[in-house]
Amino acid sequence: DIYSTILDAPVIEASSIKIAETAKMYENVQRDVLIALANEYADFCKSEGININEVTECAASKWNFAKVNPGLVGGHCIGVDTYYLMKRAKDKKRRMNLVQTARHINEAEPKKVATQIKNYAVFINAQRILLLGFSYKANTPDCRNTKVADVYNELKRHCLVVDCFDPLVDTKKVSKDYGISIIHSKEEVQTDYDLVVQLVNHNVFNEMGFTDATFIKLKDL
């Protein structure tokens, strides 16, 4: 009754708080598993020379296909609840084999993405790289558990010259939490980048042009 007085959204009643929390966990874990499948299927498609984006669109023509795109899994829900579930299951002497496998796949994704960027940079002889987006998902300043940080650090580990631009995030908080200096305004972005990689789909990036550099999105790596 309290929620219905303060929320405009429909309120779904559960018989107990345990049911409600377990349902929310199920939703997050299911998405983690589906993204892991998309990531693994994308790898298969790439090995076959097939475009995963077109495959996904075609498959989505069937009404009951769960349209999930491959990508990085960060944030404070999807990649976190999975560990709560596995710990709870372990306490009950149960194993969540599928869930654990999905988590391994998604945890490996940042390193894989960094390797793809590095290889592409070598292919086009790019000396300077700009990453677009730092938050864990599009159109939010929230950087909790963002996997862009892992991609950035992996690229730096390979001694590449890399900057990251995100006009939505709190740069001081990013510096404190991750030790990474983020470019916050478009005016600060230099014009001598050879490769620009969009990792987060902020709408604001649609209004910007990077005509002097090779531009690529995460989904096209």
Q: Can you say where each PLM-predicted feature lies in the sequence?
A:
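Structural/interface elements that position substrates and couple domains in central-metabolism enzymes
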Residues: 1-221
